[in-house]
Amino acid sequence: VANYESYIENWVHEIKKPLSLMTLLLDNRKDEMSPLVHTRMLYVRDHTRQNVEQILYFSRLGAVHKDYYFEPLPILETCKEAVEDNLSLLEEAHFSVTYSGNNCTAISDKKGFMFILGQIISNSVKYAAHDATPAIHFSVSDNKEIGQIVLSICDNGTGIPASDLPFVFDKGFTGDVGSYLSRSTGMGLYLVQQMASDLTIKIDIHSNTNGGTTVILTFPKVERPLGR
C-alpha cells in the first residue's frame, strides 16, 4: 500500500509539471491565440487538473495518516474561490453563478472542502440543462438553534432519477443509460462522500429528473472551550 501511495504521489507530481507549463503558456502567449482557442485550452487544463485531483484524493483517502488542517473558513468566500478555480469550465458551459446568505464561518480543512466544491461544480457542468441557461446557486444559512452552518448548492441541470438517488455515493455507480450519472466514472460523488465523512460534514442530495439537483452540506457544531 505504501508503494502504491508513493507511486500515485510521484505520478501526480510529474503530471503537474506539464500542467504548470501549460498555465505559463496560456498566461504569457494569450495574445497569440484566438479567444476561442484560449478558452478551450483553459477548459482542457482545468478538466485535466480535476481528474488528477480525483486520483490524488482517492489514494489519500486510504492513507493511515492524513494531513488535514482544520481552521475557521468563511464558507461563502470559499465557494467563490472554488468558482474562480473552475471558471473556465463554467464559462465554457455559459453558466450563471449566484450567491445568497451570510458569509458564515465553519471549522474545516480548506483543501478537502475545496475538493468537494470542485467535484460538485464539475458535476453541475457535466450535466447542465440544454433547454435553459445553465445556473448554479450557492446559499449559506446559519441554524443558530443547533449551531450548524448549512451550505446548499443548487443547479438547474438534468437531475437524477429517483431510482438512482440511493446509490449516487456508491463507488463506481453510473446509473441507467441516459441518466444523470451514465457519462461519469462513478468516482466523483463517491470521493465527495468519503471526503465529507473524513471532515465530519453531513451531505445530502435532492433531485428530480429534469428538475435540477441540490447538494446540501451541513457542517458540525464545534464546541469552543470557555475562556479562563
Where would I find each of the regions flagged by the language model?
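Short helix-loop "hinge" at the ATP-lid/N-box region of the Bergerat-fold HATPase_c
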Residues: S124-A128
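Short beta-strand/loop element within the Bergerat-fold HATPase_c
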Residues: T133-G147
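Short conserved segment of the HATPase_c
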Residues: I160-G172
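Acidic ATP/Mg2+-coordinating residue in the GHKL
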Residues: D155
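Short conserved segments within the C-terminal catalytic ATPase subdomain
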Residues: L89-Y99
